[in-house]
Amino acid sequence: MAQHDFAPAWLNFPTPPSSTKPFLYSDKHSEGLGRSDCAFNVNRQRHSSSDAFDSAIGRPHGGNLAKREKIAWRPQSRAGAEPTWQRDTSPHPYSMKSQLHSENNTSEIDLPRKVDREERKMFEVEDFSSLYPEHERGKNSFAAGLWEYPVSDRSRSSQMLGIKKGVKDDFSLSGYSIAAGNQSLPGKHWAGIKKEECKSLTKESSIGSSFYQDCPHEKYRPNTSLHAELLAVTPCSLEGEEDTNLNNRNGSCPERDINLNFDENKISEDNGNTLMSGQISSAYPPDGVLSSSLEAEFRLLREMGWQEDSENDETCAPLTEDEMKEFQAISEQLQKNGLRKHVFLRNALALDLFHDSVQKEDSETSSSSDTSDDE
């Protein structure tokens, strides 16, 4: 036993020899009672002054004297054995059987805890799938996603490369931001698209890319408004509009017509895609843009009923010198008439006021003469 802080320095407790016999205890209750008995015996040995001194010499026992033996009473075990008197070898007598029993109990207790922890984690993963992308990735690897029968990640990446190539060539697939360089598109944008839709999109993108590659840059200009789209026609002659429309639908001729341009823009708005039709280069001035726009305006005016030959129309003819002189004379006469009329009105008003005042004076004189006659 080690020395305690509250014990005096001259008090030494001898340590009993260790024995090779293992203690056989059946449960933890008996083990706890054994511990309490050991503690009681140690306290009794510590506080009794008669045990610590030799009766003949009157000094405390040294470490070289006979070692003190301690007797402890053990309770009855489950097997029905009678209490035995045994010698304690250590202050904490743990048996091998009790240790194995405690280890089994702890393993049995930890197992349901581990299962509960795993179940709780699974619930969290299912409820908050965005916080656990690894679980979602593993789950999607078994389920059919964009392709109905995915073979491997390599094959899926090769198929996506074909789609991305068509997207980079054509800008008609809006709604999906195209990054610069070789940056790949996120897979979540393609999760809700079916296989047939993807095929149609790639087909449209390949047609659009070949169309833009075949067309020269000078024959296009950016259409920034609806008015520009209505007036944007090609330098082709008006007689060959049907041929250009047919060739444009086949994708072989670079010339575009106003009707085809408007139809394509309308279809793209219905699909939710913003087609950048003809917006390739704004730095180069297009050839024949002014003449084509004027021709389109003239054609629209003719369809609305406007007549181009206005030589016989007298209302549109310019004024001659005689007509200008006549106009000036008429305007001067009107101004003079206006001044005369203003002067006449002013004089007439003055005459009316004078006439009224004269009538009032006459009435007053007549009334005064009448009163004088009555008197």
Swiss-Prot record:
UniProt KW keywords: Activator, DNA-binding, Nucleus, Transcription, Transcription regulation
A GO CC term assigned to this protein in UniProt: nucleus
Taxonomy of the source species: Eukaryota, Metazoa, Chordata, Craniata, Vertebrata
Compositional bias per record (Low complexity), positions renumbered to this chain: 365-375
Domain of life: Eukaryota
Chief location: nucleus
Subcellular location as annotated: Nucleus
Biased composition (Polar residues): 96-108
One Gene Ontology molecular-function label: RNA binding
InterPro entries: Vasculin_fam
Encoding gene, per UniProt annotation: gpbp1
Protein name: Vasculin
Region called Disordered, residue ranges: 49-109, 356-375
Pfam families for this protein: Vasculin (PF15337)
